[in-house]
């Protein structure tokens, strides 16, 4: 790995139930790039994990649920200064166990949010693009999002530039 240009691998999952997504309101950590944003559940890969291993572990840690039906929807590449993050984006509609609402207390607060209301919440501009793709049930996609600070400056979907 090039220390000058680090890479990060993460997973993110939106659990779906009754027209709602389970979302995490990131309000706990003060020095958090996602502070006060609403995102799905997920996190960073640990050594030797596959995307699926990371997905299952992160969802279990942050919700108390064990996924039984999930789908890889796309890969989102974030360009954040010199950092490149590859995020494996999933949705899930099957699980076992009971939701532990305070399982993610170190990260924030879990809430079921109607899909129609998500874009009105404090979310990253690029997330609005993949929310639309998820709602349209778009087949597997590759989305590249370039940020300068908090500002989305470029979005490329399946190698086509999107006007933002």
Model-inferred region functions:
Residues 139-148:
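Low-complexity, intrinsically disordered Gly/Pro/Thr-rich segments
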Residues 45-68, 78-133, 153-160:
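Unchanged
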